[in-house]
Amino acid sequence: MVKQMPHEFDAGMKVTRNGRFSQAVFNSYDIPFDDIYESLIKQGYIPGVHIKTVVFDLTGKDVDRDVIKEAAETLNEGRSYVRFVGDFMVVFLYTKVARDFTTISHDRIMSSLDETIHRPFDVLCGISQMFEDLHEAGSAFKQALYALEYRDFYRREMRIMREEHYEEIAAGAAFEQVVPYYLVEESCVDTAFVDFCLSQAFLTTILADDIRNNTKNFQILWFYLAYECNASSVGRRMFMHRNSVLYHLKQMEKRYDFSLERRYFREKLMLDFRLVFMNLSEASLNTLFEN
């Protein structure tokens, strides 16, 4: 018998992707490498230094492009090259010297992106990983777009975890932060197969049992994995004694026949959780994790 998501959450089920960033969309954008390379060289860029691509989504925004471009050019102490590609403002941030891993690190640039672009212009951004070869700008552009697309899912997860940098994600997200969601969904293009995976995941059964029995095993299991198997941290988060956390976990292992001692199972379970999260509305997720 195929299990379904608990009916209490049926209204919250949602389509996770709107198709804006499909492969066809990627192919429709022309990234003029030669032109960008020449412009960067004139600006002081030295081949071999580190680069990050930041993509701001201007879709539907009444923004003066000259004004926002001028603001973006002040980022990273002026080591910033700005290019408009369709409805996106693409910003290349680069370091002064090679092997400089700190100047454009995530922590360094997020506050300036928030203060200089996000707050004044109300636009979101996605950030690529650091790279060196400018000819890889197309892949970095993809990473930044995916960061934009999966930002909301990551932000919801951080709110559940009550992470200190939750507000920081308001400005945007880095690809490194959203990659679990990218891997989950991009590897599951067969929707019938995804539905099968979701229906057969015992997390769905745990969630249904929680609703029926007014228990919180779903939350306990998520926090245990998210806190790297630290029962004390779970106890503090859920106002329980660590021994109670361990007791509930043991009961789950026995009832649903699994073992958290197996690393591969824990890794798979984290992906299953994110698959469930992506198929719940934000309201349903908030209800599920409210204390």
Protein language model regions, located:
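Cytosolic nucleotide-utilizing catalytic cores of signal-transduction proteins
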Residues: 2-8, 17-291
